[in-house]
Design a protein with these regions (language model features):
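Active-site flanking residues adjacent to catalytic metal/cofactor-binding acidic residues
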Residues: 20, 43, 149, 267-268, ...
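N-terminal amphipathic/basic-hydrophobic helices that include classical n-h-c signal peptides
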Residues: 1-14
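FAD/FMN-dependent oxidoreductases across multiple families
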Residues: 219-293
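Conserved FAD-binding catalytic core of PHBH/FMO-like flavoproteins
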Residues: 151-235, 242-245
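Glycine-rich FAD cofactor-binding loop and adjacent beta-loop-alpha segment at the N-terminus
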Residues: 17-82
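Short glycine-rich anion-binding loops that position phosphate/pyrophosphate groups of nucleotides
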Residues: 25, 153-156, 279
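Conserved N-terminal helical subregion
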Residues: 65, 78-175
Length: 294
């Protein structure tokens, strides 16, 4: 596992760490390290990532506590959920599971772009962090770094050293959007297992809810009106508007090699799972926790 293959080194004694990429994972990792007063150089290909404003992340209570304490306070960005209800395609006639814990917070939803912007702003003003566009001249200097952490699946380092992986394609595609609706007490997440695939309603405020629909057979996507499906399966909200749909392919992967010399693979480059489990970014936070404690 990652924990057993991380370099045998005390990271707090390293003078400088280089992080490749400026994804949400890369910035989260960088912020955790600069908080330990470790000098971090971030090398990236694209200066401005075009982050979808319809993408959201579910974060567990324990990971939120760690994030607030060790990385940055994200409480103002969170929408706390106290219950999860799971239905079959029959909806109210067949509720499969009901998760709740004495009216306490189970997990929280945060919008990707909001979290990204606050991390980017804090790192830009941090004396321990230096951001720079990656070019071929930087390749030779990577070997001189004490530790390089690669979070970018698209760069030349990935293609050269981290191309061997075990991949599972689901022939599925996730569609995301935000619905705007009348104001309600909105602290319950809904998951409906439709015939076409799971449909999630994830509250982000009292009048907005994030939608994630995973289409089981992507070849059939042209036959399905996803906006109509959302309206048909919705039994809770008085919808005013459905934002433009965005989508991405679903697959899982694990690298065969987690590191090369002084370069460590990290985040989605290292391992990726189906978002239905809700563990993608939660796994990343747990990996950051382990790495920071070495």
């Amino acid at each position: 596992t990652l924990y057993h293959l991380i370099f045998i080194v005390k990271i707090k004694n390293i003078m400088k760490v280089c992080i490749l990429g400026n994804s949400l994972t890369a910035l989260t990792l960088a912020k955790s390290l600069v908080n330990l007063k470790i000098n971090v150089e971030i090398l990236y290909i694209k200066k401005n990532l075009n982050l979808s404003k319809t993408r959201t992340i579910g974060i567990s209570k324990s990971n939120i506590d760690y994030f607030n304490k060790k990385i940055t306070n994200i409480n103002p960005l969170l929408w706390k959920l106290k219950k999860i209800e799971i239905f079959s395609d029959n909806l109210s006639r067949e509720k499969l599971v009901n998760f709740e814990k004495d009216n306490e917070q189970i997990f929280s939803i945060i919008q990707n772009h909001n979290l990204y912007e606050i991390l980017k702003k804090e790192l830009s003003n941090n004396k321990y962090c230096y951001l720079k566009i990656f070019n071929n001249n930087d390749l030779s200097s990577l070997k001189s770094k004490d530790l390089t952490i690669n979070c970018d699946p698209q760069n030349i380092i990935t293609k050269k050293y981290f191309s061997k992986k075990i991949t599972k394609k689901y022939n599925s595609r996730a569609f995301t959007t935000i619905i705007k609706h009348d104001k309600i007490t909105n602290n319950t997440a809904l998951q409906i297992f439709t015939r076409e695939g799971p449909l999630a309603f994830l509250p982000i405020s009292n009048n907005e809810t994030s939608i994630v629909f995973s289409l089981n057979n992507y070849r059939d996507h042209k036959k399905i009106n996803i906006e109509q499906l959302i309206k048909e399966k919705n039994f809770k909200y008085k919808i005013k508007k459905i934002d433009k749909l965005q989508s991405f392919d679903l697959h899982s992967l694990n690298l065969r090699s987690y590191y090369h010399d002084n370069i460590l693979a990290f985040g989605d480059l290292l391992h990726k799972i189906h978002p239905l489990a809700g563990q993608g970014f939660n796994m990343t936070i747990r990996d950051i926790k382990i790495l920071s404690n070495i």
